[in-house]
């Protein structure tokens, strides 16, 4: 069996739903080799709790039905992400509790956003380790109206241990349409500017986007429009609510002397000032 976790998922899913029948799913099976991993999510009861929350998710052989609900992910993929990350953080209950709350939330947008994070964690196991992460504090919303302007970053890294890591990461699972609205959304702008104020170099901030829902160049274009619209505000003195020239030079380049210099950089979406935008 190539992937026994997916096999377990399939059996449990069909067992719970009693809707879809498939060959080989006539009895419940828990593979012994996965006992330790399943223990990390609370064993069989934890598995059933997860599946109950994701009853609206598409299965692996459901073709395209329902794929957009969870950013193109199937129930098989999401369970595997959940179990693997739970096992990785089994000795950091402070971190796992936050992730578990998001993954099992009654809010579909929160679950989808958490799955975006889980998928990224699983793809990059050497980066997202219990030792590398200091704190997790996440709140995901479907629309810009749901944004939390005063919330902390989703992930704070311990980059004293690993200087190659950013200090903060923000996970955004928006689609193209939503990204196209950020330049005119006060909540998003307020949150973004507060994040810029919290770092001393742009390398310490990363926005991790969901590449299943938006192309990175589309997201860069959205930030380009935001920068153009907010340039004058960003150059205001900090006591007036801006970043100030010195902070902008720290973040985006010492060669910036005024708003015009900044906007010259903004015009090119391949300029390093956009390097804080990352794909999962």
Report residues per predicted region.
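Catalytic toxin/effector domains delivered as secreted proteins or via bacterial secretion systems
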Residues: 26-280
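Classical Sec-dependent N-terminal signal peptides that target proteins to the secretory pathway
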Residues: 2-22
């Amino acid at each position: 069996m190539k992937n026994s976790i997916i096999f377990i998922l399939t059996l449990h899913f069909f067992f719970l739903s009693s809707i879809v029948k498939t060959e080989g799913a006539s009895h419940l099976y828990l593979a012994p080799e996965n006992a330790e991993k399943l223990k990390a999510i609370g064993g069989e009861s934890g598995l059933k709790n997860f599946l109950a929350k994701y009853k609206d998710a598409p299965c692996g052989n459901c073709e395209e039905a329902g794929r957009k609900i969870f950013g193109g992910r199937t129930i098989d993929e999401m369970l595997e992400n959940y179990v693997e990350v739970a096992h990785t953080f089994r000795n950091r209950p402070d971190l796992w509790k936050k992730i578990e709350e998001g993954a099992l939330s009654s809010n579909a947008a929160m679950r989808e956003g958490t799955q975006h994070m889980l998928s990224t964690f699983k793809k990059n196991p050497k980066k997202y380790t219990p030792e590398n992460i200091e704190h997790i504090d996440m709140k995901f919303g479907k629309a810009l109206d749901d944004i939390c302007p005063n919330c902390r970053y989703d992930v704070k890294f311990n980059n004293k241990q690993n200087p190659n890591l950013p200090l903060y990461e923000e996970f955004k699972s928006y689609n193209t349409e939503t990204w196209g609205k950020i330049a005119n959304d006060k909540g998003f702008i307020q949150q973004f500017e507060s994040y810029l104020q919290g770092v001393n170099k742009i390398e310490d901030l990363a926005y991790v986007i969901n590449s299943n829902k938006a192309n990175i160049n589309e997201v860069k274009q959205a930030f380009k429009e935001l920068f153009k619209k907010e340039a004058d505000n960003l150059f205001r003195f900090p006591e007036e609510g801006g970043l100030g020239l010195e902070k902008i030079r720290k973040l985006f380049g010492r060669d910036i002397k005024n708003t015009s210099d900044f906007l010259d950089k903004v015009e090119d979406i391949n300029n390093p000032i956009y390097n804080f935008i990352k794909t999962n």
